[in-house]
Amino acid sequence: PVAIMDNYENLRKRYRVGVNNALTWTPIKGLTAKTELYLNRNWNETQNWTGNKAEGEKYNTAKLTKGDGYYTRWSTTLNYDVQGLGDDHKLGVLVGNEVSASKSNSSYIKGVGYPDEWDMGYAFANMNMSDKTLGLDEYNNTIGTPSHTLSWFGRINYSLYDRYLFTATMRADGSSKFSKDNHWGYFPAVAAGWRISEEP
């Protein structure tokens, strides 16, 4: 156990930047418009060092894993409470859309066979100086494919006497992850309710 502790080091770093802004306004009575923009950017790095004196290890080994990515979302909605229907009827209509995009990349490097006098910091500063004759080095680099989605949605809410409720929704989602011939999915739904507690 002591040998493992003395010959094993792990360093992980993560960074994230996020921005979320929203704007809401009411141009006319009953109509509320809202737009929201969200941005997220992230980076991460992990350094793993295993010395040759650790249990089960023959060589000094350095492993470096890196990743980065982003996610953005922009949504806009219009919500209108219909005016002039009297006290018995309430009708609300909402329409909107949402656009999002994301992507992630990753890379992995493993170097084996560094000189005994090297420590973790020196090895990671000179990862290309591993012992290539061992044939144990590994390299992998993945460039992610951007993913995009576009959604349109709408909702109608109606109530009579605040007792009898009806809701209808419709959503259409398009995604770059869907098959080429079927980029869109459609999701309609209806619901009804009755507030017994409001009955006279």
Residue spans for each PLM region:
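Outer-membrane beta-barrel transmembrane strands
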Residues: 2-48, 64-83, 92, 100, ...
